[in-house]
């Protein structure tokens, strides 16, 4: 797990250096006449404010740096499109108010969620083993033919992702990442096939990235 807080505050070159290991799961160091490749498979979690002052989108707030939209666009524009394209889940988390703190706990607690994730991972490992792919244990490791084998869509799903690909300008990488997330959501629901609801949710997690690219 690699957690980067205040994501856009890192140097753009440093952030973009993560692109290759995020894609391949390894990193190659070249020095003089030597070239060495190390394993570097990790899960990246980045957290950021919507803008430098952190108030963009708040009702009744006027940014001292100018228009709220401009402040947010400039700040979020520090993240390159190719980097954003490699992040599968883009989630907006609203500020927590004092009133939120006294609300009852969610119906599904952390322990229940962890158990559901463990069951999904176990199901994935068994699926790939049954397909003769023992080197793959999770959907995150599935690429190309392996992913296409386990993430087949019905006609309704194909129509949905075709329309979304045009509207959201999905890259080939983005398309495959949506399939991977949809397959995982189906596994969490103990569903044999990817349903429209799983595909729709997977696409929704890329909507914020699409907005950021348009703003930039």
Question: What kind of region is each of these model predictions?
Answer:
Residues 2-6:
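Walker B beta-strand of ABC/ABC-like P-loop ATPase nucleotide-binding domains
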